[in-house]
Amino acid sequence: MDLLPRVGIGTDVHRLVDGVPLHLAGLHWPDEPQGLEGHSDADVAAHAACDALFSAAGLGDLGSNFGTADPAWAGASGAALLEETARRVRAAGFEIGNVAVQVIGNRPRLGGRRAEAETALSAAVGAPVSVSATTADGLGLTGRGEGVAAIATALVTPRHHGSA
């Protein structure tokens, strides 16, 4: 196995709906009037991080690992998916360097809870996770407030097993 670091990218987007609690970046947002619709808790930040980690390790993507046809993951938290993703990446022979996640949406405003989100996601991954946020200036589904998206990158390095 090549010992050079590998980078992966992941994205996720979910629609905002009434009557669903909002889970985003490993946190519950009890004051938000809408939540994200999905098979699991629809935490787009955690899901994008999972996709980035799977991509970097060459292990497929979120859907091929935790598909909607598998009832075991119905309602699962983003943190649980991220913990299992990190376990699978490490089991495949990789160390996780870091993950960077950018959330795109009008709500919630992440600034006041950024450190808390980074702590929650880092704990799930077992490696540093940074979180940033932006809006889409009124453009597209995130700009119109119809949903929230996230983009993530991950750095993994193959573990060296003995000398050549």
Curated annotation (Swiss-Prot):
- Residues at which a divalent metal cation binds: D12, H14, H47
* Reaction catalysed by this enzyme: 4-CDP-2-C-methyl-D-erythritol 2-phosphate = 2-C-methyl-D-erythritol 2,4-cyclic diphosphate + CMP
Q: Nucleotidyltransferase: present as a keyword of the record?
A: no
- Output the superkingdom of the source species: Bacteria
Q: What does the cofactor section's free text say about binding?
A: Binds 1 divalent metal cation per subunit.
Query: Sorted alphabetically, which SUPFAM superfamilies does this protein's record hold?
Result: IpsF-like
UniProt site positions, description: Transition state stabilizer? H39, T135
Instruction: Write the Enzyme Commission number(s) for this entry.
Output: 4.6.1.12
The entry sums up its family as follows: Belongs to the IspF family.
Per UniProt, subunit arrangement is:
Homotrimer.
Keyword annotations: Isoprene biosynthesis, Lyase, Metal-binding
Q: Which Gene3D superfamilies match?
A: 2-C-methyl-D-erythritol 2,4-cyclodiphosphate synthase
* MF (Gene Ontology): 2-C-methyl-D-erythritol 2,4-cyclodiphosphate synthase activity; metal ion binding
Q: What is this protein's name? A: 2-C-methyl-D-erythritol 2,4-cyclodiphosphate synthase
UniProt record, GO biological process: isopentenyl diphosphate biosynthetic process, methylerythritol 4-phosphate pathway; terpenoid biosynthetic process
Binding-site list for 4-CDP-2-C-methyl-D-erythritol 2-phosphate: D12, V13, H14, H39, S40, D61, L62, G63, T134, T135, A136, D137, R144
Taxon lineage: Bacteria, Bacillati, Actinomycetota, Actinomycetes, Propionibacteriales
Primary enzyme class: lyase
Among PROSITE patterns, the record links this protein to: ISPF
Q: NCBIfam families annotated for this entry?
A: ispF
Q: Enumerate the cofactors the protein uses.
A: a divalent metal cation
Pathway(s): Isoprenoid biosynthesis; isopentenyl diphosphate biosynthesis via DXP pathway; isopentenyl diphosphate from 1-deoxy-D-xylulose 5-phosphate: step 4/6
Q: What does this protein do?
A: Involved in the biosynthesis of isopentenyl diphosphate (IPP) and dimethylallyl diphosphate (DMAPP), two major building blocks of isoprenoid compounds. Catalyzes the conversion of 4-diphosphocytidyl-2-C-methyl-D-erythritol 2-phosphate (CDP-ME2P) to 2-C-methyl-D-erythritol 2,4-cyclodiphosphate (ME-CPP) with a corresponding release of cytidine 5-monophosphate (CMP).
